[in-house]
Amino acid sequence: MASKEVLEDTVEERVISEEYKIWKKNTPFLYDLVMTHALEWPSLTVQWLPDVSRPEGKDYALHWLVLGTHTSDEQNHLVVARVQIPNDDQFDTSQYDSEKGEFGGFGSVTGKIETEIKINHEGEVNRARYMPQNPYIIATKTPSADVLVFDYTKHPSKPDPSGECNPDLRLRGHQKEGYGLSWNSNLKGHLLSASDDHTVCLWDISAGPKEGKIVDAKAIFTGHSAVVEDVAWHLLHESLFGSVADDQKLMIWDTRSNTTSKPSHSVDAHTAEVNCLSFNPYSEFILATGSADKTVALWDLRNLKLKLHSFESHKDEIFQVHWSPHNETILASSGTDRRLNVWDLSKIGEEQSAEDAEDGPPELLFIHGGHTAKISDFSWNPNEPWVICSVSEDNIMQIWQMAENIYNDEEPDIAAAELEGQGT
């Protein structure tokens, strides 16, 4: 039995390796930017910070990322890293590095990704998210039940060698660990967290700690009957949020309700565990959920009884789903199949040739195939449209942007230019 499993693993490794070679060979045609960086330890979490700096006279901009570590028994850290991304006009396909499968003029740009701040953390960082109203404040999910809050301006850039973790706040309320974490973009300091203990906790950190650094949950929502995988505030309504769980349900909650045990809406969303959700930043009624049933579902809050659409192409569980911050119809999803799919809602139902249909449905805009292990998290860059950072379980972090001709299908207006000066 064991030898059969070993054989299967070897075959899978060979397939992954072959697929990666093909991907690497094709990157100049598929991307305007690819940076591959091996982290010292894998990160389970990634999020771009909102700041960008464009140094005068330089051919790049500086961006920042929040990462974490997942070590094998060594000290863990919350990490803020600085990234140099070349300006659009610097993307030069002739700079392609076939060995690394990288290009974008990066051979010449040294020190493109550097760790700026490392803060001691209790166990691995399951997830880290910054507070929109003050991006220096970062909340983290730990292997314990506590949620930690750090103001990274109050910590030295190099961690204390003792390994002591010294968060600015410790949020109590859960009995077990989890992953889901969401700051309210309309109410400063309001944080939601999802947990394996079947609950969602809400804290208001602006109220400050009662004693020491401990803040107790303001409310605990108990509607789910299994592990709650993810939670997200609505982006426009300050009192609405959604949660998804292993009970296969999507629940919509209103914090103004006088009950915390019953959601406003509960939907059987998928045929397996629901792992993630994301509200559309442009359309107040639209949200998406991702599931172990390998699909992403599209929902309208005005009629949750009816699933608007099911996106099908992933070969395994989906763990992340995020709408683009720049395009109302663009959505991306990733997970266990090592692929990050970018979808375009505006293409749903378009006619396809039989050949194109073999590659996936018309709404599947792009498949990022650069990872050779499960993707743990990804983040859309808020300042550079179409730039995504994705991290996988094998320590690899990739910062990439698909080729413009893939998402910009308008034909270049050559005819008009040719006609200029020809009279009418």
Swiss-Prot record:
Family to which this protein belongs: Belongs to the WD repeat RBAP46/RBAP48/MSI1 family.
GO BP annotations of the record are:
cellular heat acclimation; chromatin remodeling; DNA replication; negative regulation of cell growth; negative regulation of DNA-templated transcription; negative regulation of transcription by RNA polymerase II
Please state where this protein is localized.
Nucleus
Q: Which UniProt keyword terms apply here?
A: Chaperone, Chromatin regulator, DNA replication, Nucleus, Repeat, Repressor, Transcription, Transcription regulation, WD repeat
Source organism per UniProt: Gallus gallus
Origin: domain of life: Eukaryota
Q: One Pfam family for this entry, by name? A: WD40
Q: Know the name of this protein?
A: Histone-binding protein RBBP7
Which SUPFAM superfamilies has this protein been placed in? Answer: WD40 repeat-like (SSF50978)
What does the annotation say about its assembly with partners?
Answer: Binds directly to helix 1 of the histone fold of histone H4, a region that is not accessible when H4 is in chromatin. Also interacts with histone H2B and HAT1.
Q: Which residues cross the membrane?
A: none
SMART domains xref list: WD40 (SM00320)
Keyword Nucleus belongs to the record: yes
Q: Which GO terms describe its cellular component?
A: chromosome, telomeric region; cytosol; ESC/E(Z) complex; nucleus; NuRD complex; NURF complex
Question: What InterPro entries does the record point to?
Answer: G-protein_beta_WD-40_rep (IPR020472), Histone-bd_RBBP4-like_N (IPR022052), WD40/YVTN_repeat-like_dom_sf (IPR015943), WD40_repeat_CS (IPR019775), WD40_repeat_dom_sf (IPR036322), WD40_rpt (IPR001680), WD_repeat_RBAP46/RBAP48/MSI1 (IPR050459)
UniProt region (Interaction with HAT1), positions on chain: 359-404
Main role?
Core histone-binding subunit that may target chromatin remodeling factors, histone acetyltransferases and histone deacetylases to their histone substrates in a manner that is regulated by nucleosomal DNA. Component of several complexes which regulate chromatin metabolism.
Q: Which GO terms describe its molecular function?
A: histone binding; RNA binding
- Tell me where the WD repeats sit in this chain: 47-121, 127-172, 180-216, 227-268, 274-311, 317-368, 375-402
> Where is it mostly found?
nucleus
